[in-house]
Amino acid sequence: MDHLVFEVGTALVLVAIASVIANKIKFSIIPFLIVLGMLVGPHAPKMGIIDLTFIQSSEIIEFFGRMGVLFLLFYLGLEFSVGKLIKSGKSIAVGGTIYILINFSLGLLYGFITGFSFLEVLILAGVITISSSAIVAKVLVDLKRTANPETELILGIIMFEDIFLAVYLSVVSGLILGDATSVGSALLSILIAFGYMLLFFIAARKLPPLLNKLLDIRSNEVFIIVIFAALFFIAGFSETIHVAEAIGALLLGLVFSETEHSDRIEHLVVPFRDFFGAMFFFSFGLSIDPFSLGEAVWLALGAVILTILGNFIAGMVAGRRAGLSHKASSNIGLTIVSRGEFSIIVANLGIAGGLSATLKPFAALYVLILAILGPLVTKESKRIYRLLNKVFKWKPEVQPAKKQG
């Protein structure tokens, strides 16, 4: 008997209950949904007609999750100005380079110290380096920090990470899977990623007058269909040229942010962002096998500590180089500390290449801890800054009059 709709309905009821509980105790919804996903899924018991394994509906739930990432990044793009990002181009390039160098170097060092082979070390370093754009976007929106002075640099670092990821995956997949053209593929990936982003920046500067006319649609029904058609087409096309679909959504949001319809788009997108965003974190939890985590506990805990320290240092250095205050700079590293879907993808590449089986449970546990801990660290960034300020005696600096979370 086909219970597909009932399975999806059951999943939504569980997500709703977890969301209500998180809201009641004024806690981030993200860890609740991830843990909920882990407790059910393929390893959960089947109780009569209530099937908590969600095997039949897994592809639909996973697709809901992918949509969540798109809406989260699209909304984040709507919150920014391309003009400001272009003006911050140098600081973004410098900040992104600093962030990648510090975290990737620490990952390499940790891999060698813990006894992995060269190729396994490259995989482990990749797992540790790439942050979760979906979680970062969700946290920035939830804590109302999109107007903060450091958020433009955070957004830039996320985009810079995508360029690094394209190059990294091309090179490492060539080394592990035996692709002899890995160097050429890496160079092509760089050119495509840079060119694609540049195209959207140009569009955001030149096309708003045309877009204002095209989007001058009175009917909300037709308007939202047009916006969603553009969103999914651009995201899907981005994937075909090996740029993350989430980055495509972010870039489209940046273009629409320059139009006079940006507020209307935001208003209509918010419910979809919240619903599908919740489904992303639930589906992410479903992908984690809780019974495989024990063998990598200490390895993951060490990596978590290293990541938090590395992120904080990288954020401070990048922020200060960009002229931000100590407080804003500390927020950078404490905001992009979460790890997620990209780390799992990197680990799976290593498994596909026949590397150590420990990589998968390590990545799962590492991501789980930081996906839960990351939003908490971001939320408590003010307290963390005050504590560190007592130790390092940073001079208090006055930020521009923007709302800080």
UniProtKB/Swiss-Prot annotation:
Membrane topology annotation: Multi-pass membrane protein
Record InterPro entries: Cation/H_exchanger_TM, Na+/solute_symporter_sf
One of the protein's GO biological processes: proton transmembrane transport
Induction of its expression: Part of the khtSTU operon. Induced by salt stress at alkaline pH.
Keyword Transferase attributed: no
Description of how activity is regulated: Potassium antiport activity requires the presence of KhtT. Activity is also modulated by KhtS. Has higher activity at alkaline pH.
Physiological role: Potassium/proton antiporter that mediates the efflux of potassium ions from the cell. Can also mediate rubidium/proton antiport, but has no permeability for sodium or lithium ions. In the absence of KhtT, does not have antiport activity, but can catalyze potassium efflux. Involved in protection of the cell from methylglyoxal, a toxic by-product of glycolysis, via activation by S-lactoyl-BSH of the antiporter activity, leading to cytoplasmic acidification and methylglyoxal resistance.
Oligomeric and partner information: The transporter is composed of the integral membrane protein KhtU and the regulatory protein KhtT.
Name of this chain's protein: K(+)/H(+) antiporter subunit KhtU
